[in-house]
Amino acid sequence: MKAADVRALSADQLKDELAKLKKEQFNLRFQKATGQLEKSSRINEVRKDIARVKTIARQKAAEAKA
């Protein structure tokens, strides 16, 4: 997910997206542990997407306070 796409989301949508990504990350870790994971690079992609969502959510919260 690109940063521009994330910036277009509202605060509630960001929370939903973050929850979805964390669930996906959990499932990927579980697949890795059981040897069923096909694309190991997806773990890093999801981790970076989570960071993107958290960063933009924090920026939006700071803008709202200012």
UniProtKB/Swiss-Prot annotation:
The protein's name is Large ribosomal subunit protein uL29
Q: Name one GO molecular function term.
A: structural constituent of ribosome
Name one process (GO BP) from the record: translation
In the record, the note on similarity to other proteins reads: Belongs to the universal ribosomal protein uL29 family.
Q: Which PANTHER family match?
A: 60S RIBOSOMAL PROTEIN L35/50S RIBOSOMAL PROTEIN L29, LARGE RIBOSOMAL SUBUNIT PROTEIN UL29C
Instruction: Give a yes or no for keyword Ribosomal protein in this entry.
Output: yes
Assigned GO CC terms: cytosolic large ribosomal subunit
Q: Which organism is it from?
A: Rhizobium rhizogenes (strain K84 / ATCC BAA-868) (Agrobacterium radiobacter)
Q: Which keywords are on file for this protein?
A: Ribonucleoprotein, Ribosomal protein
Family annotation (InterPro entries):
Ribosomal_protein_uL29, Ribosomal_uL29, Ribosomal_uL29_CS, Ribosomal_uL29_sf
